[in-house]
């Protein structure tokens, strides 16, 4: 059985918790996109784990995989492995596999990301972790892959090939180009390459073989549908495709092998950073939901903007992902709120739409038809 799990909103829907609950029934859990710009929190007993790269199934018996659609900061991966091992969770190459084709985030990606965001007249709210620039290099065929990181000669040769252009880019943006060939940073990356050599695998081969053997495989997304680089609220989006279809493309699994696509949906809606949020609650009520729901980013610590449930937004996510099931989270956060409200229809220039159109283009001209529920005092 092959199951894909994605967030149906703007991320932070509770995917980590649901994946962790379901993972006991799966043999393999794979992450298929994003980087350490998104995180999820998993609680086991009294222990709280904040993850940014390693899939949630690491705490159970599943084999966990990081696919080639991910952009990976090897330093962050090393920190997560160290965190687990301090808590007695062994993360060896039998437990974790990283695809050889996975692009790595270099220090110059982080530098370029920060410089670019600082130069924008309108900020897009990037986490400045180099994610976007790593994806730019992937598309431009200027990436450094895990297969090269774990091979000293190939890594140094590839870096030398790319360095002149990266130095020019950083200098042109007012940064210090010496970061590209910094000896201490290069030494550290070579050490990380040695550490991860045993983890290298072919994720597509592993997943297809597992499915052929009748095993259960779960593909886990980061972020949410409406942050998708193509279908999201551009330019306030992430740098990768967050919808279910990209799981097949990024993991190298044919779409006819998909059995279930599960939507993770929060009973209200949140968004981190900039971008449209039609049902946003400004003021005391929004702050109350933010506090009750613990709506602060795992990665950045930034407070999340909160709003009422948005049905047209969800219907668009259903169309984009082809969901077979929906998991509703954080309904308890709304306990005691009276009345509860939700957006049912988006009205644009006198025409009603029950499914979201182009949110960024239409949000300035849209009015929401809200439904009120008086059951907020009930659990």
From Swiss-Prot:
Pathway given in the UniProt record:
Purine metabolism; AMP biosynthesis via de novo pathway; AMP from IMP: step 1/2
Q: Does the keyword Cytoplasm apply?
A: yes
Active site residues per record: 12 (proton acceptor), 40 (proton donor)
**Names of the cofactor(s):** Mg(2+)
Binding residues for substrate: 298-304
| Entry binding sites for GTP | 11-17, 39-41, 304, 330-332
Which residues are involved in binding IMP? 12-15, 37-40, 127, 141, 223, 238, 302
**What does the note accompanying the cofactor annotation read?**
Binds 1 Mg(2+) ion per subunit.
What is this protein for, i.e. what is its function? Answer: Plays an important role in the de novo pathway of purine nucleotide biosynthesis. Catalyzes the first committed step in the biosynthesis of AMP from IMP.
Query: Subunit notes for this chain?
Result: Homodimer.
Q: What is this protein called?
A: Adenylosuccinate synthetase
The species this protein was found in? Methanosarcina mazei (strain ATCC BAA-159 / DSM 3647 / Goe1 / Go1 / JCM 11833 / OCM 88)
